[in-house]
Amino acid sequence: MEKAYKLLGKHRHYDWGGKTFLPNLMGVENVNHLPYAEYWMGAHASASSTIYTSEGEKDLAALIKDNPAQWLGKDIATKFNGLPYLYKILDVRDVLSIQVHPSIENAVIGFKAEEVKGIAINAANRNYKDENHKPEVMVALSDFWLLHGFLPPAILEERLNNYSYLKPLVDEFKGADYQNLYAYFMQLPTEATDEILKPLLEEAAKAVAKGTLTKNDPHWWAHKYYVDGIPAKNIDKG
């Protein structure tokens, strides 16, 4: 059996992606001016790579499923029963919304529950696309700004108290309850979050216009997300 194989990955055309970097990298002509956000190489069920073998082109996920020990080795096949990582190349043109990754235990439970409910894997209300918890390692090929985690309790509480439109959230953070604060905000009706976020975005826009913000300030990124104007309603909670 050959030791190395050529792989052809799959492009993901998410709205936030750029239109030139990945097509140029992969030698693809973007005739339809689509956003090329991600290039996946792996055996994910929704975008498995094509592998070139002596017997022709094959689906990588199908090969692994049919004979995991042959393609992954006995140890990896026994421990993970599948390829345990997904390699991605990203071209992030627009600001991404918030992401929350579950623990491995919750991922397994959540995936099985949504399978039982019959929620389509590509449905908008589908939370668990697979049983993985998705720890990530990122290598930046250019400057990349990332907001990761939460502020320390004292600083976050001070921040909430410093802005009148954020004060309604203070009570939800009693005892440094990050989980309660996050769950409360994300489950608020859209109209309620619009009332909180609109003044934040208006303040950010004024500060940017005055030149008083830098990329180290979260307000700068809030403004960048809606750089073309603040929507009248349905402001993104993330």
How would you name each of these model-derived features?
Residues 1-216:
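Transition-metal
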Residues 208-238:
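Acidic, glycine-rich loop-and-beta core segments that form the ion-binding/anion-interacting portion
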